UniProtKB/Swiss-Prot annotation:
Belongs to the aldo/keto reductase family. NADP(+) binds at residues 25-27, 53, 169-170, 193, 271-283. It comes from Homo sapiens (Human). This is Aldo-keto reductase family 1 member C8. Pfam families: Aldo_ket_red. InterPro entries: AKR, Aldo/ket_reductase_CS, NADP_OxRdtase_dom, NADP_OxRdtase_dom_sf. The record marks 87 as: Lowers pKa of active site Tyr. GO terms for molecular function: oxidoreductase activity. The gene is AKR1C8. Keywords: Cytoplasm, NADP, Oxidoreductase. The record marks 57 as: Important for substrate specificity. Signal peptide: none annotated.
Length: 326
């Protein structure tokens, strides 16, 4: 993926559509009122975001969809200007559950198609109504579903016109190869959405994805929201990093803007997540400055392979993605 950031704010996916290089993430911890997701999405569209990232797991698809439709109804945007992503959750990986899961999400959202439908994590969980099905001892119940079967079901969703593109999330290079080497593959993943920030810069995975014409999409690009359900609260705060602060000062910006701009200049599509009106505006203002090669090198040097979202509960699953180097 290469794009001239001065000329274009989007990148062409390997199956044709364009994806805006800066997206708005809609995940929020359980204690956040769902109405905030709707309000924040409307603010994001007002300030210029056209790439909206949601998921069944976030349990706010209806609110986010409603916000998008309100902005279409008031003339701020047209549907074709919005790039909307949703994700297949781990309890729906069996092939026969994929199409109904997407249709359910579409019903909540209102549109008759999404722009991108991605496998949220590579490991499956026991099907059912629970987001995180647990056994009597409180352990999450995982199951093994062949990823290639799930992928084939996504291909059928694309062929049925329910989604324009299909992709994956939280895959390592070996899991990507599993899909890429699938006999009878019709469509390869357009993207791999992973945790990516200066403390975990994913340089090897980025090179691998570029070599396969797969776009790397960064989540937790500003560090993490530190939801205790997923993240160790003792992890260092990325935006307190002195090197990011000094580079930000030089460019009259914020550490968050530097962290986002860093990804764009590496050829990574980046998601920014905030429910604060001021921060949403600030996060969009990353197209009017450029980091120098020295800045980029200094930020590269911050990598410490620090993963905020470890998904440790799935460590023994055969498709657990984080036991490989990349």
């Amino acid at each position: 993926m290469m794009t001239d950031l001065k000329q274009s704010h989007s990148v062409r996916l390997n199956d044709g559509p364009f994806m805006p290089v800066l997206g708005f993430g809609t995940y929020a911890p359980d204690h956040t009122p769902k109405s905030q997701a709707a309000e924040a999405t409307k603010v994001a569209i007002d300030v210029g975001f056209r790439h909206i990232d949601s998921a069944y797991l976030y349990q706010n698809e209806e609110e986010v969809g409603q916000a998008i439709w309100e902005k279409i109804a008031d003339g701020t945007v047209k549907r074709e200007e919005i790039f909307y992503t949703i994700k297949l959750w781990a309890t729906f990986f069996r092939a026969e559950l994929v199409h109904p899961a997407l249709e359910r999400s579409l019903k909540k959202l209102g549109p008759d198609y999404v722009d991108l439908f991605i496998i949220h994590v590579p490991f499956a969980m026991k099907p059912g109504k629970e987001l995180l099905p647990k056994d009597a001892s409180g352990e999450i119940i995982l199951e093994t579903v062949e990823l290639c079967d799930t992928w084939e079901a996504l291909e059928k969703c694309k062929e049925a016109g329910l989604t324009r593109s299909i992709g994956v999330s939280n895959f390592n290079h070996k899991l990507l190869e599993l899909i890429l080497n699938k006999p009878g593959l019709k469509y390869k993943p357009t993207c791999n959405q992973v945790e990516c920030h200066p403390y975990l810069n994913q340089s090897k995975l980025l090179e691998f994805c570029k070599s396969k014409d797969i776009v790397l999409v960064a989540y937790s690009a500003l560090g993490s929201q530190r939801d205790p359900q997923w993240v160790d609260p003792d992890c260092p705060h990325l935006l307190e990093e002195p090197i990011l602060k000094s580079i930000a000062k030089k460019h009259s910006g914020s550490p968050g803007q530097v962290a986002l701009r860093y990804q764009l200049q590496r050829g990574v599509v980046v998601l920014a997540k905030s429910f604060s009106q001021e921060r949403i505006k600030e996060n969009f203002q990353i197209f009017d400055f450029e980091l120098t090669p020295e800045d980029m090198k200094a930020i590269d040097g911050l990598n410490r392979n620090l993963r905020y979202d470890k998904l440790q509960f799935a460590a023994n699953h055969p498709y657990f993605p984080f036991s490989e180097e990349y």
